[in-house]
Every structure is written in structure tokens, then in C-alpha cells.
A protein has these predicted regions:
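Short, structured segments at the rim of ligand-binding sites
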Residues: 1-241
Length: 241
């Protein structure tokens, strides 16, 4: 699966592009037309707030202007498969990209299986999905995700290490993990291994866990989302989360 953001943007500027599988073909045009480019919100960043809305009791949040490109929307599909109360509103196109406002409400989640073709659409969201699985009733299995081992950290081992110290029943596998959820995790000392997605995932986990959580190397979030903690804490102080 190849993400098609570039093809969509060029098409919005008058480019003539065809694609098949992982091959994109650009056909000649006289000129491209200048456009006002509006970049949608990144669903990989929105995923943490989606998860927070689902696992923190009493939550109801609206995340506006999020890109929901089908090559990136696996997080939405998995949340729904786990019983998450998620709705897409104001669906539209901006510069060729599908965009929506995502409404999330606290839900009683249940386990699911995440595997196969959906993996490329949510590879960066798997750590926060593992956190959601810890709060969900029943078993969640993640497989076909060996790429997690060669990210900024070995995310399979690191998620297993940190969820275990929070009291979660998790077993790492060669290409994923098995999580038996349903018990509220306890606060713990979390090692981020300087991986921004690990730090952000456990900041969300801390919102709904018992006791205090300390994330070592928490400033690693600056690589992708420098204002993450400010935004998360601002939301946590609101009337809905």
C-alpha cells in the first residue's frame, strides 16, 4: 500500500495522474494551476486524542479537520471494531484530500484482531491501539506488524515492557503482541526510549490509570508534536475529558 497524498495534491492543481498498485504515472499537461494549499490535521497525531476520548469516562470531544485518506484511516476502523463511539461529520475534500471532523465519546471497548491489509494504514498508531487494548474487555491480537521492531525503538518490546509494569497482561510476539485487557492499569515509571509515539501513548494511558505515571524522556515528543502535552492537558482540564 502506497500513500497517495502527492498524487491527490497534484491532481487538485490540474495534474493528470493515473495510478495502479504502487505505480503512479504522470501524464503531460500544459501547466499546473496554483492553489491555496490547506494541510489537513494528521490522523497519526489525532489518534492520541481519539484514544483518550474513548478510554476516559465521561469524555466527548470533537477533533476538527482531520485527514481521513483511505490509506491512513485504519485507526478509525479499529476503534469502531473495538466498539468505540466514533462519528465522522462535515466530510469534505480539501485539495483533493478527504477531511472530516471526528466526534469521539467514551465507550466500553472490547478486544479485536488487527492484522493483514489494515496494518500499513495504521502502523504508527499501533502503540496507542495497544494502550486502548489494555482498557478493553477481552483479548486483542496485533500481528503482521514486524515493522514495529525497526521504528525509533523496538515498539513491540517497548510496549510490552511498559504495559507490563502497569500491570497489563501482554505477550510480545515476533510480529506483534497479545493483550488481555479489562483491568485498569496502574501508574508506573515509563521508559520512552526517546520514541515520541511511546511517550504520547503512555501520556494518554496515564489519564485513565490508577496512580501517578512518570514518563522518562518525555520531551522526545518534540520531534513530531512539540505542543502535545499542552494540548492534552488543556483537553484534560475541559468539561468533557
Amino acid at each position: 500500500l502506497s500513500r497517495n497524498h502527492t498524487e491527490l495534491m497534484l491532481g487538485a492543481c490540474g495534474g493528470d495522474i493515473s495510478s495502479e498498485g504502487t505505480t503512479a504515472t504522470l501524464h503531460p499537461v500544459k501547466r499546473l494551476e496554483a492553489q491555496k494549499i490547506i494541510v489537513p490535521g494528521d490522523i497519526s497525531s489525532a489518534a492520541y486524542f481519539m484514544a483518550a476520548g474513548l478510554i476516559v469516562p465521561g469524555s466527548e470531544i470533537c477533533i476538527e479537520n482531520v485527514g481521513i485518506n483511505p490509506t491512513r484511516d485504519g485507526m478509525i476502523r479499529v476503534c469502531q471494531a473495538m466498539g468505540g463511539n466514533i462519528a465522522l461529520e462535515n466530510i469534505r475534500e480539501i485539495c483533493g484530500e478527504p477531511v472530516a471532523d471526528i466526534i469521539v465519546r467514551h465507550s466500553s471497548l472490547h478486544g479485536t484482531v488487527v492484522e493483514g491489509d489494515i496494518i500499513p494504514t495504521l502502523i504508527d498508531e499501533l502503540p496507542i491501539i495497544a494502550v486502548m487494548a489494555a482498557f478493553a474487555e477481552g483479548q486483542t491480537i496485533i500481528r503482521d506488524a514486524a515493522e514495529l521492531r525497526v521504528k525509533e525503538s523496538d515498539r513491540i518490546s517497548v510496549m510490552a515492557e511498559n504495559l507490563s509494569v502497569m500491570g497489563v497482561d501482554i505477550t510480545p510476539t515476533t510480529d506483534g503482541m497479545i493483550i488481555n485487557g479489562g483491568r485498569t492499569p496502574r501508574g508506573a515509571r515509563i521508559q520512552s526510549h526517546m520514541d515520541h509515539r511511546i511517550a504520547m501513548s503512555f501520556a494518554v494511558a496515564a489519564l485513565a490509570s490508577d496512580g501517578e505515571t512518570d514518563i522518562i524522556g518525555s520531551d522526545c515528543v518534540n520531534i513530531s508534536y512539540p505542543t502535545f502535552y499542552q494540548d492534552l492537558f488543556k483537553l484534560a482540564k475541559s468539561s468533557f475529558i
